[in-house]
Amino acid sequence: MAAKIRREDEVIVLTGKDKGKRGKVTKVLVEQGKVIVEGINVKKKHQKPVPALGVAGGIVSKEAAVDVSNVALFNPATGKGDRVGFRFEDGNKVRFFKSNGELVK
């Protein structure tokens, strides 16, 4: 199945503690059905120092993955999250917003 949400897409979170927040997709984990979104689902990790690699220890903040069903592509025309469909235009498969039919940029 084709990916409805891709890297660099702007998405809005539908559920959870970050509900309503927007961010840019930095990574798509296809096998797990998850995405990593900038500034969303930030977790703290206790990092041990590794002097051989020059890595300092401490508490590091890192974005954790969010299930793809908990985010929707942000439609700038409506200002809301929207569903995405596919259609062919000039022999190319393109994504479009289902609410107003505009192409996803």
From Swiss-Prot:
PROSITE patterns from the UniProt entry: RIBOSOMAL_L24
Gene3D superfamilies: 2.30.30.30
Coiled-coil annotated spans: none
RNA-binding found in the keyword field: yes
Signal peptide: none
Keyword annotations of the record: Ribonucleoprotein, Ribosomal protein, RNA-binding, rRNA-binding
GO molecular function (one): rRNA binding
SUPFAM superfamilies to which the protein is assigned, alphabetical: Translation proteins SH3-like domain (SSF50104)
Gene Ontology biological-process annotations: translation
CDD domains: KOW_RPL26
Keyword tRNA-binding: no
Ranges that cross the membrane: none
Pfam families documented for this protein: KOW (PF00467), ribosomal_L24 (PF17136)
Gene Ontology cellular component annotations, sorted alphabetically: ribonucleoprotein complex; ribosome
Quaternary structure (record): Part of the 50S ribosomal subunit.
Known function: One of two assembly initiator proteins, it binds directly to the 5'-end of the 23S rRNA, where it nucleates assembly of the 50S subunit. One of the proteins that surrounds the polypeptide exit tunnel on the outside of the subunit.
Family: Belongs to the universal ribosomal protein uL24 family.
Annotated protein name in UniProt: Large ribosomal subunit protein uL24
Species for this entry: Tolumonas auensis (strain DSM 9187 / NBRC 110442 / TA 4)
